[in-house]
Every structure is written in structure tokens, then in C-alpha cells.
């Protein structure tokens, strides 16, 4: 958390042109919750920059949180230098599902590299969560990860 406290007066790493305290900092300190999927995406990127792995875990859809490996996430964060974030596109898929396409620039072993992804976010009880496609997902006939009660194939599975 020391990196968070030192960053409060600095520009936010998510490149929103706001100070961290007025942007992602309030989400990291749980003073507020992201109101949009894009805000959650930006706050998760910033959490990686600041190595705030607990925030990464709690902003992943609850049914997937126990499947994450915080130690591996921490190792990855410790060995990655993030250089920038560009939001390419945001889409509202349904009232409770959105997609954010982004490009994150980071320093690789020999040169700068880019990670581009289209991430899916779901809103559960008025809070946005990231659906992690890298952990085990339900089969198409099982209940959806978002807790909607629908089968996965008729809900979030259609977007992943």
C-alpha cells in the first residue's frame, strides 16, 4: 500500500489526465466504486502499475476470485514495467455487460511491447467486475459466472 500513498498526489497511471487521488485512487482505497466498465478497466491497469494485487482479485467476478493465483499475479506485476494505456473501444453489450478493448504498453526484456485485449465486464449488485478468461470457465450448460441464473452460453459465454 506504500506505493498507493506515494502516488496520491501524482497523475494517475491510467492516463485519464486526473490526479490519482481523484481517479483510480478512490477505487483502490474503497472510497468509491467504478461506475463504468472503462473506469474499472483503468483502475485495474493502475493496480497492476502499483502492484496492488488484492484490488485485482476483488474486482474479478466473485465466482472466479478463488481460482486466481495472487502469488503469480504479484510475481508478474513485480517483473513488468507498465508504460501506458490506450482505451480503443468501449461497448455496452447489455444492461449488465460491457466490453472494453484496450492496448497496454509495457517494457519487455529487450524492447517495448503491447498487450491488446477485448475484456468483458459484468455488473452484479451495482458493481462492475472483470470476467477473467484465463481461469477455468463453466461449460456452456452450467450457470453463468456473473450469477444471473442463466446458462453460461446464453449470458457471458456469448461474449468470451
Swiss-Prot record:
This chain's protein is named UPF0225 protein CGSHiGG_04185
Q: Which Gene3D superfamilies match?
A: 3.10.450.50
Alphabetical list of Pfam families matching this protein: SEC-C, YchJ_M-like
Q: Report the sequence similarity comment from the record.
A: Belongs to the UPF0225 family.
What HAMAP family does this protein's entry cite? UPF0225
Specify the species: Haemophilus influenzae (strain PittGG)
Concerning PANTHER family, the annotation shows: ADENYLATE CYCLASE-ASSOCIATED CAP C-TERMINAL DOMAIN-CONTAINING PROTEIN, UPF0225 PROTEIN SCO1677
- What InterPro entries does the record point to? NTF2-like_dom_sf, SEC_C_motif, UPF0225, YchJ-like_M
